[in-house]
Amino acid sequence: MVRMIVYLVGLVASLLWMSRSDPTNGWFAIPSGLAIGFGIPLLDALMVNFRHLEVVWYALRTWRGRVRISASYLYRIRVDNEYLLVKGARFDQFQPVGGVYKSHPSSAGRRKQLGVLDDDLLVPDAVSEGDLRVRVPGKHLLSFVRWFEQGQGRETDGCREFHEELVATGLLPQDLFRTIKYDTLGRHYEPMRYSQWAQSQELLIADILELLPTPAQMEALRQLKANPSPQVLWASESQIRRMGATEGLANQTTRIAQTATWTIDITR
């Protein structure tokens, strides 16, 4: 970010110099060359730091207030062109396997420095302790996002929620899914918006992971698909985009969380 500011100042100074120089003079090549020299890396820096620029804008809008942040990881689990979703524990809907990251005790000092408060919406319990579902002062929003992106002082692995939601519940056999492999497809930032539910501005961040099953694990997933469970929904892309609705049905009772669309729309 500092380098980007330096490039911007250099570009502006070069353009001002050019505006006061005679294009027919040989010295004109100096400011024009400097403008190109500063302009190209500035463009590159803008592309690299686009996300941070967006967060800076959010911070300016909420400087004196707080932003509710939920930082999570969500799985894309696809078998024969259908996606595995599980019943939500708190809401009556189907959603991707996954959940919020947890912070480590080592981050307590940094969290205190940034004025981070725990979420005040959900009743805290042993399961939610350490969840990265927090309230951050707007003036520290960029610093918090940078801390999160560094991956220090917090959970970075995506295995815990997979095990809790699919293995510990008996939906998938423990002997086959003791270890799993996944690919990180990207990080989704939902544009900040005012949440009526939270009564505050809200920024949702989600890492999208794709399960890479072994042949034996794929067979177990197909067996799960062949034996319907009320805790599981195998949804097509169309049904996910319709938030659970199925074309042609008179009684639409299935609800799918919007987060499911993030897992199919993510681009690297």
Language model regions located:
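N-terminal leader/linker segments that precede catalytic domains of diphosphate-processing enzymes
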Residues: M1-R268
